[in-house]
Design a protein with these regions (language model features):
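Active-site groove signature of glycoside hydrolases
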Residues: 28, 84-134
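Catalytic domains of carbohydrate-active enzymes, especially glycoside hydrolases
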Residues: 6-36, 91-99, 187-192
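An active-site-proximal structural segment forming one wall of the substrate-binding cleft
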Residues: 71-103, 175-188
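Aromatic-lined carbohydrate-recognition surfaces of secreted/lumenal glycan-active proteins
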Residues: 1-6, 56-58, 130-177
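Glycoside hydrolase catalytic-domain groove-lining segments
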Residues: 134-159, 179-183, 187-216
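Structural preference for beta-strand elements that scaffold enzyme active sites
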Residues: 2, 24-28, 52-58, 96-100, ...
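Active-site-adjacent "subsite" loops/lids of carbohydrate-active enzymes
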Residues: 40-49, 54-91
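Acidic-and-aromatic substrate-binding clefts and catalytic sites of carbohydrate-active enzymes
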Residues: 1-13, 28-41, 63-75, 108, ...
C-alpha cells in the first residue's frame, strides 16, 4: 500500500516518513522532469530508504510536453527514463524501488475534454472519436513498451496507473485507450493500478461517497 505525494515540498514529505514506516506504507513521490539530477531530491529518496519507506518515482513531464505520460509524449518519456536510470547509476543518485507511469490524456487534451464535459457535453464523444488513430496509437504503445522493458532489465519495477474505464474494453480491443491516448494493455507491466477521483464524481452527483467508491 502506498500514498502519493505530488505537490508537497521535500520537508513535508520527509516529515511523513516516520508515520509511513510505522504503518508499513510506501510513497509514490512525484519527480517533475526539471528535478532530474537534483541533489536535494536524491537525498530525500535516500532518507526514505533509511527510514524503511518503500519509494517509487512518479515522473511528470512539463505541461508543454503533456505532463502525464501517454500516447503523445512517448519520445519524451523514453528520454526522461534514460536520464533517470543514468542519474540512479551515479554516485549520490536517487534510491527507489520502482517507477509509476501516470497514464492519462496529455494536459492540453485533458483540458479540452474537461471544457467539453462542462460546457458542451454533446461534443465530448466527437472529440474522443477524432482522437482514435490506430496506427499512431500502435506505434506509441510499442515505443512505451520498449521503455518499460529497459526499466525492467535494470531491475526497476514498472507500475502503470490509469483510468478504470479501460477495463470496459473487450479483450484485445484498445479503442478506449486510443480515444484517451493512454496505452496500457499489451505492455509488460509488473503492476497495474486504477485511479478513481472522488472530486469530479461528487461534483456530478452532489454526494461524497468516501472509500466505498474506490472499493467498488
Amino acid at each position: 500500500f502506498s500514498v502519493w505525494a505530488e505537490l508537497m515540498d521535500d520537508d513535508a514529505v520527509e516529515a511523513a516518513f516516520g508515520a509511513l514506516a510505522a504503518q508499513g506504507v510506501g510513497v509514490g513521490l512525484s519527480l517533475p522532469s526539471v528535478r532530474v539530477g537534483d541533489a536535494g531530491f536524491a537525498k530525500l529518496t535516500r532518507k526514505a530508504a533509511r527510514a524503511g519507506v518503500p519509494l517509487r518515482i512518479w515522473p511528470l513531464l512539463s505541461p508543454e510536453h503533456g505532463y502525464w505520460i501517454g500516447e503523445t509524449n512517448v519520445a519524451e518519456t523514453r528520454d526522461l527514463m534514460a536520464s533517470l536510470l543514468a542519474w540512479r547509476s551515479r554516485r549520490g543518485g536517487p534510491v527507489f524501488d520502482g517507477v509509476s507511469f501516470d497514464l492519462e490524456p496529455d494536459f492540453q487534451y485533458s483540458e479540452a475534454l474537461r471544457r467539453c464535459a462542462r460546457l458542451r457535453p454533446d461534443r465530448a464523444l466527437s472529440l474522443l472519436l477524432d482522437n482514435v488513430t490506430p496506427t499512431r496509437f500502435a506505434k506509441a504503445r510499442a515505443s512505451l513498451a520498449r521503455t518499460v522493458q529497459t526499466l525492467r532489465r535494470a531491475g526497476i519495477v514498472a507500475h502503470a496507473v490509469t483510468y478504470p474505464v479501460v477495463l470496459d474494453q473487450a479483450v484485445g480491443d484498445t479503442t478506449l485507450e486510443d480515444a484517451l491516448s493512454i496505452p496500457v494493455s499489451g505492455i509488460d507491466w509488473d503492476e497495474v493500478s486504477f485511479m478513481v477521483y472522488q472530486t469530479p464524481i461528487a461534483q456530478l452527483t452532489g454526494r461524497w461517497f468516501g472509500p466505498a467508491l474506490v472499493r467498488s
